[in-house]
C-alpha cells in the first residue's frame, strides 16, 4: 500500500490538464505509441469537438521512480468548467492529493481557486505545477508569486513543465511520489468501497468506478450496496490503463471498475458505499453533497412516440451524471415531456446534445428558468421552477429570487467594463481586492441573470481574460412578474417567462417582435401579444396571405368587386375561428436569445 498514490489533476479551463494526462500515460507506458492520441481520456465525441473535459476519467499506471521503487499511480483527470465542478469534488473524494496545474502565461484564474479550495477543504496535499513554460509569454516567476498571493500555497519550488513538449513531466511525477501521502486504510478490515462514478453499458449493465477505502474486493465476492441493502455478485473487476483490464482483486487504496450485472439504473447510486455481504462494514462512508440544480428547462420529444425512449435515455444519462434532475411534465402546446434541472447553461447544452447524439432523439427545449421562492397570501412557501407553476398575481404575498455570489478574477484594465456589466445585470458589489495586476471582484447577482448569458458577456467584455466562479447564496424578495405570450388570444404556456418588472416591457416587446419574424404567415392574421396578468404590454401581427380575388374582373362593376372581397373576408373570418397556428422550434428558442442582440 505504501507505493500507491491516488491523485487528481485540477485546473482552470484550458490550462492543460488533459495534455498533461496524455504525457503521464505516455511516460508510464500505459498505451503504446501507436494507440496514443491527443486527449486520450476525453473519450466522448462531444468532449473532443468542444475541446473540454466533461466527465472525470480514471487511469492506473506504474511508474518507476528514481529511488528504484515502482509506484502505482491512480489518477483522475477532471473537468475545469464551472458547470462541472461537482465532477471535480467527487473525484477529489477518492484521492489523497491533487496536482494544481496553472498556465505559466495566464496565471491564476477563478476556477483554479475554486477547485483548489475544494481540495484543501478535503485535506488533500496540493502540489502546484506550472505548465506551458515553452510559451514565449510564459512568466513562471510572476505566476509562482500569484499562486502564493491569491491561493496562499507555497509555490517557490513549484515544478515547471511543458505538457505539450514533455519537458519536466518526469519531475512532476517524482515530486508527486515524494509529496502526496499513500492511502490510509485497513487491508484486513471489512470491505468499504466508495462509488465515484457509474455509467451504463448495454452489454454489462451498470459499470461502477470504485475506490477501495478498507478491505479487499475479489472477483466472485458477494457485494452489498449499503443504501439499498441489495446484494450482487462481483462478476468482473479491474482497472483502466486507459484500456479496461480485468484483475482478480482490487486491494485497499486502489481505484478500479466493477461490474455486478446490476440492471436497475438506481441499483448503485454514486456516492454510495459497497461492502461485502459476508462481513459487512458497520457504517457507510460519508458520500457526496447532493448538488442542487440551478437552472430548469422543459425538454419535450418532437414526436410523442419517442416519449418512452426519451424516459429511458434520461434514466441512463442521470446514472452517469449525478447532478441531472428530472420529473415528468406536460404542456398543452408541446405534449408530454420532462422538466429537467441542470447546473448551468453549458450543462444543459451538453445534456441536450448527448441525448440527441447518443440516444438519437429529437428534442424541443423551453426557455431555462431558475427556482423562485414564493410566499402565498395563505402564508405558504412554495418553490417554483417553471413559469406555468407560478400562482396568480393576487395570490402572491412575496416573490423571492435566488441570488448568486459571483467571484471574478480579471486584469485591472477591464475593471470598468466588467463593473458596468454587473450593474446592468442588477448586481451589488460586496468586495474588491487588488493582487498585483489582477483584481478579485465579488458581486451578488440574481441567478436568473447569471445563468442566462452572463458568462459569455463577461468573456467578451474582458477579451476572454476574466474568469468566473459562482454559487447560490440566498433568496431575496424582488419585484418579478410573469410575461405570458398569447397567440390569437390563446396563452402558450411553453413561451412564458419570469422577469424583473423593470425589464418586462422591453423583454415582452422584444419577444413579440422575435416571434413575428419566426411564425410563418398563414391564411389569416395572427395576433401575437405579451401580457402581464390581463394587462397587454406589447403586440404585433403576422399579416395574412391573401389571394387576389379581383384578378379575373377586367374593369366591370364596382359592386361585383365588393361582393368578391366581402366573400373573401368572411372566409378568412371563419378560418380564423377554427384555424390553428403551428409554432416552429425556433420560436421556442427565441426566448433564449431575448435580451442578447440589442446590447
Curated annotation (Swiss-Prot):
It catalyses: GTP + H2O = GDP + phosphate + H(+). It is a peripheral membrane protein. Its main location: membrane. SUPFAM superfamilies: EF-G C-terminal domain-like (SSF54980), P-loop containing nucleoside triphosphate hydrolases (SSF52540). Its EC number is 3.6.5.n1. PANTHER family: TRANSLATION FACTOR GUF1 HOMOLOG, CHLOROPLASTIC, TRANSLATION FACTOR GUF1-RELATED. This is Elongation factor 4.
Amino acid at each position: 500500500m505504501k507505493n500507491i498514490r491516488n491523485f487528481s489533476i485540477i485546473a482552470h479551463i484550458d490550462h492543460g490538464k488533459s495534455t498533461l494526462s496524455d504525457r503521464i500515460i505516455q511516460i508510464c507506458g500505459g498505451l503504446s505509441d501507436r494507440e496514443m492520441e491527443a486527449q486520450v481520456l476525453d473519450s466522448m465525441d462531444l468532449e473532443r469537438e468542444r475541446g473540454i473535459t466533461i466527465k472525470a476519467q480514471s487511469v492506473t499506471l506504474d511508474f518507476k521512480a528514481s529511488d528504484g521503487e515502482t509506484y502505482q499511480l491512480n489518477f483522475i483527470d477532471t473537468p475545469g468548467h464551472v458547470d462541472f465542478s461537482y465532477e471535480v469534488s467527487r473525484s477529489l473524494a477518492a484521492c489523497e492529493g491533487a496536482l494544481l496545474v496553472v498556465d505559466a502565461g495566464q496565471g491564476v484564474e477563478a476556477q483554479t481557486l475554486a477547485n483548489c479550495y475544494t481540495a484543501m477543504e478535503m485535506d488533500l496535499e496540493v502540489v502546484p505545477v506550472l505548465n506551458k513554460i515553452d510559451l514565449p509569454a510564459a512568466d513562471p516567476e510572476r505566476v509562482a508569486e500569484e499562486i502564493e498571493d491569491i491561493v496562499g500555497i507555497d509555490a517557490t519550488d513549484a515544478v515547471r513543465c511543458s505538457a505539450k513538449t514533455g519537458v519536466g513531466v518526469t519531475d512532476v511525477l517524482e515530486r508527486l511520489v515524494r509529496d502526496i501521502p499513500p492511502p490510509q486504510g485497513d487491508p484486513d478490515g471489512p470491505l468499504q468501497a466508495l462509488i465515484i462514478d457509474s455509467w451504463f453499458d448495454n452489454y454489462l449493465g451498470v459499470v461502477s468506478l470504485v475506490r477501495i477505502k478498507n478491505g479487499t474486493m475479489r472477483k466472485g465476492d458477494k457485494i452489498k450496496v449499503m443504501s439499498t441493502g441489495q446484494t450482487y455478485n462481483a462478476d468482473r473487476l479491474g482497472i483502466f490503463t486507459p484500456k479496461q483490464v480485468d484483475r482478480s482483486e482490487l486491494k485497499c487504496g486502489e481505484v478500479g471498475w466493477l461490474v455486478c450485472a446490476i440492471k436497475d439504473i438506481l441499483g448503485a447510486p454514486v456516492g454510495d458505499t459497497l461492502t461485502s455481504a459476508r462481513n459487512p462494514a458497520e457504517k457507510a462512508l460519508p458520500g457526496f453533497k447532493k448538488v442542487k440544480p440551478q437552472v430548469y428547462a422543459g425538454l419535450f420529444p418532437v414526436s410523442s412516440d419517442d416519449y418512452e425512449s426519451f424516459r429511458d435515455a434520461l434514466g441512463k444519462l442521470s446514472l452517469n451524471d449525478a447532478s441531472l434532475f428530472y420529473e415528468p411534465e406536460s404542456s398543452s402546446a408541446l405534449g408530454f415531456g420532462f422538466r429537467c434541472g441542470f447546473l448551468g447553461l453549458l450543462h444543459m447544452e451538453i445534456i441536450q446534445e448527448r441525448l440527441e447524439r447518443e440516444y438519437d432523439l429529437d428534442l424541443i427545449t423551453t426557455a431555462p428558468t431558475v427556482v423562485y421562492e414564493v410566499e402565498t397570501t395563505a402564508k405558504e412557501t412554495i418553490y417554483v421552477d417553471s413559469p406555468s407553476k407560478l400562482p396568480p398575481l393576487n395570490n402572491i404575498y412575496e416573490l423571492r429570487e435566488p441570488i448568486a455570489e459571483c467571484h471574478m478574477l480579471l486584469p485591472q484594465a477591464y475593471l470598468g467594463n466588467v463593473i458596468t456589466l454587473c450593474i446592468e445585470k442588477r448586481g451589488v458589489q460586496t468586495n474588491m481586492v487588488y493582487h498585483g495586476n489582477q483584481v478579485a471582484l465579488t458581486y451578488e447577482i440574481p441567478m436568473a441573470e447569471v445563468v442566462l448569458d452572463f458568462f459569455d458577456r463577461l468573456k467578451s467584455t474582458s477579451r476572454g481574460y476574466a474568469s468566473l466562479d459562482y454559487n447560490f447564496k440566498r433568496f431575496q424578495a424582488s419585484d418579478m412578474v410573469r410575461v405570458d405570450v398569447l397567440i390569437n388570444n390563446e396563452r402558450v404556456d411553453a413561451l412564458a417567462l419570469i422577469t424583473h418588472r423593470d425589464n418586462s416591457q422591453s423583454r415582452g416587446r422584444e419577444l413579440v417582435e422575435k416571434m413575428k419574424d419566426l411564425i410563418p404567415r398563414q391564411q389569416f392574421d395572427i395576433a401575437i401579444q405579451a401580457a402581464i396578468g390581463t394587462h397587454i404590454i406589447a403586440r404585433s401581427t403576422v399579416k395574412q396571405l391573401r389571394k387576389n380575388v379581383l384578378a379575373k374582373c377586367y374593369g366591370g362593376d364596382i359592386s361585383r368587386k365588393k361582393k368578391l372581397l366581402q366573400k373573401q373576408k368572411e372566409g378568412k373570418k371563419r378560418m380564423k375561428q377554427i384555424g390553428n397556428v403551428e409554432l416552429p422550434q425556433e420560436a421556442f428558442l427565441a426566448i433564449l436569445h431575448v435580451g442578447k442582440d440589442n446590447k
